[in-house]
Every structure is written in C-alpha cells, then in structure tokens.
C-alpha cells in the first residue's frame, strides 16, 4: 500500500487528513513536528507528504520543506502544504511545493485534486 506522511500538530486536522488519505487508498504516518516529517520521510519513503506550513519543532514547517528538498534520496517526493495561508503566498514562499490545501475548509474533493496535481495516483 502507498504511504503518505502527514505533518500536522492539530489532532483534529491530522485525523481529518488521515481519513481523506484512507479514502484515497493511502496508508498514513502522522508527524506532529517538522523534524518528524523529515525523519519519517527518510524512513518510509512515502508517495506524498502533506504538511502544515507553520509546523512546530526544532525544524519548523518551511525549514522542513527545504530539508526535504536538499536530501537527494527524498527530494522528488511531492509536498502538499496545508495552511491558513492563501495559495499565492504559499507559491511565493516556496516554489517547490506540489499543491496547497486551504484551512479551515478542508474538503475531500480538494484533497483529491491536490493529490492529482502532485502526480499521486489514487
């Protein structure tokens, strides 16, 4: 089964994203902090990473994206940002994300569309 790393500190949103991933046929691993996203991605080699832009931790959200992009073994795994930021702001901050999910209105149809945009087959 394909795996998805979900980087989200809010337990409610993490559960919602986990449910969306399961409906899309993806197994999930939850990472509550930025450094956990990087470590778990190195371990499980997911097909996609969905993470909060402002994820807490010793490596925060945007720093985690940069760390993922700097690692040759995992740099090609698409990252979808889940954030309160507007999509234009996300694109301006980090041009290397594959998609964006807008909080607080997280809908399954948007989740599916973000996966397709990221090139993830479901």
List PLM regions with ranges.
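His-Asp phosphorelay/catalytic-motif detector in bacterial-type signaling
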Residues: 45-47, 73-78
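Non-catalytic signal-transmission and effector/linker regions of two-component phosphorelay proteins
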Residues: 1-11, 106-122
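Receiver (REC) domain switch-region micro-motif
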Residues: 4, 49, 68
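Conserved phosphotransfer microenvironments
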Residues: 52-68
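Alpha4 helix (beta4-alpha4-beta5 surface) of REC/receiver domains from two-component response regulators
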Residues: 59-63, 83-114
């Amino acid at each position: 089964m394909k795996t998805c790393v979900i980087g989200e500190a809010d337990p409610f949103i993490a559960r919602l994203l986990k449910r969306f991933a399961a409906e899309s046929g993806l197994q999930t691993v939850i990472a509550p902090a930025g450094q956990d996203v990087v470590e778990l991605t190195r371990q499980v080699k997911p097909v996609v990473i969905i993470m909060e832009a402002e994820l807490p931790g010793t490596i925060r959200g945007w720093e985690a994206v940069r760390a993922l992009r700097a690692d040759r073994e995992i740099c090609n795994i698409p990252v979808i940002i889940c954030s309160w930021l507007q999509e234009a702001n996300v694109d301006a901050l980090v041009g290397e994300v594959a998609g964006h999910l807008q909080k607080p209105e997280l809908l399954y149809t948007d989740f599916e569309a973000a996966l397709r945009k990221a090139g993830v087959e479901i």
